[in-house]
A protein has these predicted regions:
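Hydrophobic transmembrane alpha-helices of multi-pass small-molecule transporters
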Residues: 244-245, 313, 322
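Juxtamembrane boundary at the C-terminal end of a transmembrane helix
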Residues: 319-327
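Alpha-helical transmembrane segments and their lipid-water interface positions
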Residues: 212-216, 281-285, 309-312
Length: 327
């Protein structure tokens, strides 16, 4: 069998001497000239690590560094527990420091939007409210809040009328959201068994977060509020309620001598308020176009991001503990 004859590759028509070669297809297309000042659109390279996801480091299902989050949570829990066991007023110092930091974070976050709440009066009002709640009870807490609101309104007058209502309302929101609600934790600390009350409150809120996270990761399919918090599911909510009710029965019954059915109600209520607090802060962050209130705590964001479920739950916990386990 003879080999196939050799044939040259087709390189197009052979040019004729004295006649210009026909233009190629690429050369026949008109050249696009960018207008002055224009830039080429960036090309996105897929499959390469980004700055948000370092090489060799994968975030958890929650989108955060789970190891760092657990470590920070344990450290915070140890500080709170130690302050309650060693000397009860030491917890007031921890609470006051947390209120100051969370207030700064919230004011800075609001200023990234169109709000300009005055920082000085709300920052000074936090320790005042905590101290009056400890020394004067509910009346002192309310009085401290009213004094702070008046200070916010007067302080903002110095900047003129433009945006006054907007900024003063934002300042009142900060005073209500952080120091006023945190003051209920100070009220829980007042009775002789105040340390046990605070522990029961915090542990139940933690059970809400842990139960909701575990159930949401394992079984979450039906989104609760996709436009606010896409990762929250009704299955996770069921896990929060179940974990809180179990914790409520054990803590109210064993630590505070309350009825078991009171523990069920306490746990269910804390699960609801903790979820509302989480969703409420997520709504504020989405409105402001930010992911976290700060970056103080690795794996968590800011301190305000950890207090979002604690703050509204503190008021409900104080009221229900006063009802089911009166001092």
């Amino acid at each position: 069998m003879s080999p196939a004859p050799w044939r040259p590759h087709d390189t197009g028509p052979i040019p004729v001497v004295g006649r210009p070669a026909p233009p190629s297809a690429a050369a026949s297309r008109p050249t696009e000239v960018l207008p002055a000042g224009a830039t080429l659109a960036p090309v996105e390279l897929t499959g390469l690590p980004t700055t948000e996801q370092p090489v060799g480091k994968k975030p958890g299902r929650s989108g955060r560094d789970l190891g760092a989050a657990i470590g920070v949570a344990l450290a915070l829990g140890a500080v709170i527990l130690l302050s309650l066991l060693v000397w009860r007023p030491a917890f007031l110092l921890v609470l006051t420091a947390a209120v100051v930091v969370a207030t700064i974070e919230l004011v800075r976050a609001l200023r990234k939007g169109r709000f300009r709440p005055p920082l000085v009066p709300v920052l000074a009002g936090g320790p005042v409210m905590i101290g009056l709640a400890w020394s004067r009870g509910p009346t002192g807490l309310v009085a401290g809040f009213l004094i702070t609101v008046l200070a916010v309104m007067l302080w903002r007058l110095a900047e003129g009328p433009v945006g006054y209502l907007r900024d003063a309302a934002a300042g009142v929101l900060v005073a209500l959201y952080v120091p006023l609600l945190a003051g209920f934790a100070a009220l829980m600390l007042v009775p002789d068994d105040g340390a046990a009350r605070v522990v029961a409150f915090i542990v139940t809120v933690v059970c809400s977060d842990v139960g909701g996270f575990a159930a949401g990761v394992l079984f979450g399919k039906h989104r609760m509020a996709p436009s606010i918090s896409p990762k929250k599911s009704w299955e996770g909510m069921a896990g929060s309620v179940s974990a809180c009710m179990l914790a409520g029965v054990l803590l109210i019954g064993l630590m505070l001598g309350g009825p078991w059915w009171g523990g069920l109600i306490f746990g269910a209520a804390i699960a609801v308020t903790a979820t509302i607090g989480d969703l409420g802060e997520s709504l504020i962050k989405r409105d402001l176009g930010i992911k976290d209130m700060g970056d103080l705590l690795p794996g968590h964001g800011g301190l305000m991001d950890r207090m979002d479920s604690l703050l509204p739950s503190a008021a409900v916990a104080y009221l229900l503990l006063s009802l089911f386990a009166p001092a």
